From Swiss-Prot:
One of its GO terms (cellular component) is nucleus. PANTHER family: THYROID TRANSCRIPTION FACTOR 1-ASSOCIATED PROTEIN 26. This is Thyroid transcription factor 1-associated protein 26. It comes from the Eukaryota. Belongs to the TAP26 family. Keywords: Nucleus, Transcription, Transcription regulation. Residues 186-201 have a biased composition (Basic and acidic residues). Residues 1-21, 107-201 are annotated as: Disordered. It is found in: Nucleus. It comes from Bos taurus. Residues 151-160 have a biased composition (Low complexity).
Length: 241
């Protein structure tokens, strides 16, 4: 009777695991394995305990924007009064304020056309007396002057002239016109020089062609005409002398 061989027990996994190769068998032993290091380079500065990473920077940004909004609200809540009224001296503040009101009224009257009846009417006594008092106190404070020029100043209504300043559009228009004028002058100068250069080149070529015709003439035998060449040279020497 033939001997029966037992089934191979050491085969890799039977039918289900046929063809699989474990990675341990074919691992290269010469290559060094990378060890895990806990202190690797971080993607941001600081740590969670220190609190100086991206979260801390985001917190600072939010605080800055909040403070900026508070400053804007304070600026918008401030009353829009004239900043110069607080700087007046205390003993002359009422005079400056009265003068401001008087100038405002004069400007309003100057803007509106007056009728004939309003022109003929004299100034009221209260206004004239207040104007006199203001002008007299000004004269006494600023410089001790006689009473006559002060009275003359009272009668004449001094309306400040409006400074006619040029707008940015007008300034830009003037600058553009100046630049255009400069460009036109440069273009004319360039055209003039170009014409002069072309004229000089034309005369030079004409003269060279005449000389070439004289020197290129030949005799009946086809030889260069030396007599004409000598005459040309003598003529040139005489012109130089």
């Amino acid at each position: 009777m033939a001997p029966v061989w037992p089934a191979a027990r050491g085969r890799t996994g039977g039918l289900g695991t046929r063809g699989r190769v474990s990675p341990v068998e074919f691992r290269n032993k010469n290559v060094k394995r990378k060890t895990w290091r806990p202190n690797h380079l971080q993607a941001f500065a600081g740590s969670v305990r220190e609190g100086q990473g991206f979260a801390f920077r985001r917190k600072l940004k939010i605080q800055q924007t909040y403070k900026k909004l508070l400053r804007r609200e304070k600026k918008s809540q401030t009353p829009s009064e004239s900043p110069f009224t607080d700087w007046y001296p205390d003993h002359l503040k009422h005079l400056y304020l009265a003068e401001e009101e008087r100038l405002k009224k004069q400007l309003r009257k100057a803007d509106q056309p007056l009728s004939e009846e309003q022109v003929d009417q004299p100034l009221p006594e209260d206004q004239g007396s207040s104007d006199q008092a203001l002008s007299e106190e000004r004269c006494s404070i600023e410089q001790p002057q006689p009473a006559e020029p002060c009275s003359i100043r009272i009668n004449s209504i001094n309306i400040p002239k409006k400074n006619k300043k040029k707008t940015s559009n007008q300034k830009a228009q003037e600058e553009y016109e100046q630049i255009q004028a400069k460009r036109a002058a440069k273009k004319q100068e360039f055209e003039r020089r170009k014409q002069e250069r072309e004229e000089a080149q034309r005369l030079y070529k004409k003269k060279k062609m005449e000389v070439f015709k004289i020197l290129s003439k030949k005799t009946k035998k086809g030889q260069p005409n030396l007599n004409l060449q000598m005459e040309y040279l003598l003529k040139k020497i005489q012109e130089n002398n």
